[in-house]
Amino acid sequence: MNSYIEKVPGVSSAESSAYTGFLYFEEVGKMEVTKILNEYYGSYDEDNRLRSRHGSVEFLTTMRYVEKYLMPGMRVLEVGAATGRYSHTLARQGYMVDAVELVQHNIDIFNANTLAEENVRIYQGNAKNLHMLTDNTYDITLLLGPMYHLFTETEQKQALAEAIRVTKKNGVIFAAYCGNEATMVQYCFGRGMIKEQHYRDLIDPVTFKASSDPAELFELYRKEDIDTLMTDFSVTRLHYVGTDMATNYMRQTIDEMDADLFDLYLQYHFAICERSDLVGASHHILDIFRKD
């Protein structure tokens, strides 16, 4: 079961790619994760999703928190950089940025979008093994995509451990997750898919926690899952944030707002995005912690 950005028939590519639901890749069977990700991201426009008005809420929220901890001269790492929306933004602000990305299609776009004045490098690699990077190097580490696509606790902890390893003591790590409840509400109940036995088999009948495997592409989390992952690490949580909160439940409304109303909506969003009674309903969640 996944929080999959599904291509929905009858709507534009930008609109459909921002729909969060679960789409089971029955045709891929047991294909390896790398091949699945290459096929998905080879036809998916992540950069334009973040540039759409509704997608910009997630981007602006993430950047708002990153900028709380940025200082001149800091080194930044983005693991799972995709096409470089965050890396390029930070490099153009004058920061030295290294990026790691698994999918070649994304790397090609990343390189095509790199300006001559950017101090940025990109490596092809896996979040679970950042062997090309040395310990205690970065002031800020962004892990904004890999946790979506890791399906075992061992793999998830490997990615977190690597991000922490390469971050300096007292550096700040930003780890993003897909939330369980948004998919349950919008897809399972909103589209009635929970009535289908295939999906019922993927959902705990008591807790309504969805399960995933690589063929389903996205892993879904609740806060208790994230808390369990973090127990082995010497870190201090700084913020636990819903980066889009209500936004993806009302994408069309957001996209049709005039500038003044959208600005007011952002003020509201920023006011509630750390509320512990609401964050669990967000499609995307950001765990921000300091390396002790």
Please identify what each model-predicted range represents:
Residues 131-141:
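A short acidic, Gly/Pro-enriched loop at the edge of an enzyme's catalytic core
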Residues 217-234, 240:
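Short alpha-helix
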Residues 157-169:
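A short glycine-rich, Lys/Arg-flanked "PGG" loop and its adjoining helix->strand segment in the class I
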Residues 239-292:
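A C-terminal cap/extension of S-adenosyl-L-methionine-dependent methyltransferases
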Residues 85-129:
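Class I SAM-dependent methyltransferase SAM/SAH-binding core
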Residues 28-72, 85, 89, 173-202:
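Conserved class I S-adenosyl-L-methionine
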Residues 140-154:
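A short SAM/SAH-binding and catalytic strip from SAM-dependent methyltransferases
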